[in-house]
Amino acid sequence: EEGSLILLDGRDNIKRKNSENGYFIGPTLIDKVKSSMKSYENEIFGPVLQIIEVNSMDEALKIINENKFGNGCCIFTSSGEKARKFSQNVNIGMVGVNIPLPVPSSFHSFGGWKDSLFGDLNMYGPDGLRFFTQRKTVTQKWPEESSESKGINLSMPNNLN
């Protein structure tokens, strides 16, 4: 309705018990999203990825940091300098660099900042001791220097090497 473009509709071909009332959605990819749209202003929990194109790093940081939520976001780049700047300046609890999800591993706490922080989901392991700190998790994946860029690789890391 607001002008975004659904590239992959998670409502298609859903055949699950109790899903007819909207309790389940498959992977959904939304392009041409603007920061003024309802889908961006509200935090969507589910396999939904929204794409906002920006003209600069500063514009990206401004859009993200002005949102009242702060759960997770991703950046795809071949520049370590840009990845560091983004990771250090974005007010988000979970940051992904060159991976489609910010926290792909169970040994990290799951939790955001701002209005995305809820309950005690950051309270396991050593994080229980860090309860009164504001934590940021940055998960990164970089291609080998000799490999040529073949576009964005959306595969998850499969080892810790």
Language model segments and positions:
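Long, low-complexity segments enriched in small/aliphatic residues
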Residues: 1-5
